[in-house]
Amino acid sequence: MRLVLMSLGIGLFSFSCSVFADTSAPVCEHEGVQVFTDFQGGNVTGCEFSRAGKLSIEIAPEDEPINTSPWYAFRLEAEVQTQVPIVLDYGSYKHRYTPDLSIDGIKWQTYPQAKVSLNKNKTQAGFSVTVPAHRSLVIAAQPLLTASHYATWLQGLSEEQGVSIGSAGQSIEGRRLWRLTTPPKKHTLLLLGRQHPPETTGAIALMSFVERLFEDDVLARRFRDKVGILLYPVINPDGTDRGYWRHNFQGKDLNRDWGPFTQPESRAINSDVANWLGKHDSQLAKAMDLCRK
């Protein structure tokens, strides 16, 4: 049972449709080349073409102070195949993520790191891409993993015996706080994911780990016989779909809100966990949050 790679290829890239924008007007354009951010996870602060056609992408956080996780995701379209030089400008922040590129939203290729040129302070990163005619080229800090992916992935898991898919509540913007449960046992494993939007590698690791727990072998079956699973795969859906660096829609780091519970997302999940454990008289055996450095 390996759903992760399959789920990454679902129809996320309905590029003519925008989750946030009223229109799919380009952010900027030059001689037939257009830049868009009209998709889940798409976000840049601004962009500008020089007369020679060099594209400068401005990247800034949703608010400050903030951890340096400079997310970006945008797509390029061209009327004819065009070579486009690009500069990622982080202002006072430093370059961190080597670009990942995709034509179809299924297969991603990391741009050769050796071909990315950095300025002395590492606040700008330069590289060049070939944009095919009449097709979208997506450029992102990490391969995209958004609400659409999670919905399809969870749908696949719901076919497993005893699995129930539900919700702990809603985010500030009304997105679902997904919950997966298995039949309750004396002990429960709590799994948390995607508190920080750019941490897609941690999200993929979490998905792979969960799929391993549902394998049809002696070890996995023995585990499920003794331990219930309580999974919240995407705690910050607003930040994830908006392409934020770190925070939720109210500018809070949800991974620093376990205790104060000032945010709807952390409050909802804390309450849901407590209710689940109490209702089924189950003890929390372990809590895991898979992220990345």
What are these regions (language model features)?
Residues 1-8, 20-137, 246, 253-293:
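C-terminal accessory segments enriched in acidic
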Residues 95, 146, 238-239:
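Short, acidic Gly/Pro/Ser/Thr-rich loop/turn segments
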Residues 99, 151-153, 242-247:
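Short acidic, glycine/serine/threonine-rich loops at helix termini
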Residues 118-169, 183:
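Extended acidic/polar, glycine-enriched regions
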Residues 162-178, 184-293:
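Active-site/substrate-binding loop(s) of hydrolase catalytic cores
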